[in-house]
Amino acid sequence: MSELLDSFETEFAKFYTDSNLEETNLQKCLDHTHEFKSQLKKLKAHLNKHIQESKPEVYNKLSDKEKQKFKRKRELIIEKLSKSQRQWDHSVKKQIKYVSQQSNRFNKSTLNKLKEFDIDSVYVNKLPKETMENVNEAIGYHILRYSIDNMPLGNKNEAFQYLKDVYGITNKESTEFIEMGQIVHDLKKGDTESCLKWCSNEMESLSSNHTALSSLKFDLYTLSAMQIVKHGNPVELYYQITQNAPLDCFRHREKELMQNVVPLLTKSLIGQPIEDIDSKVNKELKECTSLFIKEYCAAKHIFFDSPLFLIVLSGLISFQFFIKYKTIRELAHVDWTTKDELPFDVKLPDFLTHFHPIFICPVLKEETTTENPPYSLACHHIISKKALDRLSKNGTITFKCPYCPVNTSMSSTKKVRFVML
């Protein structure tokens, strides 16, 4: 499986024309098409001028030499038009041919190999039918998390009905995400007011992360300033600098201000052109949107990454271990005996492992399970249920904590649930 993943990465990279995986051959087609359109516009302007000059009242006044020159000029325009069309046609056909060939190679070398084994034979414990409700809920969450900003959100009632009719998502599930989607919609349209309002409301809450929200507020101000610079309105820009500047967010950000905002504002005020302003605005918009979604999810206590996405990603990464185990099982004639524990270790990145809390009982030196959960004593030391039953003789006596002198009874213990902070 590791070889297949390496092959997958290598073949996929061939769809791009640079090592940073930013420009594809299809993007080159688009760039060449834009260039061709620009040339057509220039040639159209030349032709319009030529048509005006070819009117009888103008043309008849020309000398024979000027008429020859006029005719040659028309031929050059036609020749240049024909040459531009041929170059564009050749370039587009070449890129499309390359993409088509690479797509066929990609299917042959990677995608077809994914179908060479049966997934059900790799993982033998099937998903119980009673868990399908949880699966549907995870799918609904995934749709809400990643697609809400692309859905029609004219008003909340219409959005609720749309999500229910199309995806079967209840109003309870979609309530939190619709507000997020509406704010992201506004940001994409260049309106930062709703996001700033949400940010200010959250900063009044004692439980919010004020440092992160202050960063978001600063980035929103930067985005607004860039958008005004882009539209070239000096009066509005002056008002933005003097009246709308969030001074409380400027603390400890002098370096960012000097690097990102001040040069743009200065050039705009003195009338100098700003290179690549569109890409600068788009980059800042993406940063604001990403930071807002992250802080919104944290404030509403919802996952930033969809659990479904994390589970599928974990499955893809761990597939190589499952396939290796399948081979060993067939050769050694061993079987999988447990349903809640894998017979082998799976190495996953840290961000994929925080949903699986592990606690080793310090008394019995064994991992807690669903049948043997962790319990907190009166002194807040934690041991397993099996150790608790043994020390309390099944709840009939009080006992001293194994790690401190505090006495504990069964009634003063509480079951422990680990949460991600």
From Swiss-Prot:
GO CC annotations, alphabetized: cytoplasm; cytosol; GID complex; nucleus; peroxisome
Catalysed reactions, as listed in the record: S-ubiquitinyl-[E2 ubiquitin-conjugating enzyme]-L-cysteine + [acceptor protein]-L-lysine = [E2 ubiquitin-conjugating enzyme]-L-cysteine + N(6)-ubiquitinyl-[acceptor protein]-L-lysine
SMART domains: CTLH (SM00668)
ZnF segments: RING-Gid-type: 361-404
Keywords assigned by UniProt, alphabetized: Cytoplasm, Metal-binding, Transferase, Ubl conjugation pathway, Zinc, Zinc-finger
Family: Belongs to the RMD5/GID2 family.
Pfam family, one: CTLH
Any coiled-coil regions, as ranges: none
Gene Ontology molecular functions: ubiquitin protein ligase activity; zinc ion binding
EC number(s) from the headed UniProt entry: 2.3.2.27
Subunit (UniProt): Identified in the GID/CTLH complex. In the absence of stress, the complex exists as an inactive anticipatory complex (GID(Ant)), composed of VID30/GID1, the E3 ubiquitin-ligase RMD5/GID2, VID28/GID5, GID8, and the RING-like subunit FYV10/GID9, awaiting a substrate receptor to form the active E3 ligase complex. When cells are shifted to glucose-containing medium, the substrate receptor VID24/GID4 is induced and becomes part of the complex, named GID(SR4).
Protein name stated in the entry: E3 ubiquitin-protein ligase RMD5
Statement: the UniProt record of this protein carries the keyword Ion transport: no
Domain CTLH: 176-236
Disruption phenotype: Causes a severe sporulation defect, specifically for meiotic nuclear division.
Membrane-crossing segments per the record: none
Superkingdom in the source lineage: Eukaryota
Organism: Saccharomyces cerevisiae (strain ATCC 204508 / S288c)
Cell compartments where the protein resides: Cytoplasm
Annotated metabolic or biological route of this protein: Protein modification; protein ubiquitination
Biological process, per Gene Ontology: negative regulation of gluconeogenesis; proteasome-mediated ubiquitin-dependent protein catabolic process; protein ubiquitination; ubiquitin-dependent protein catabolic process
Keyword Magnesium tagged: no
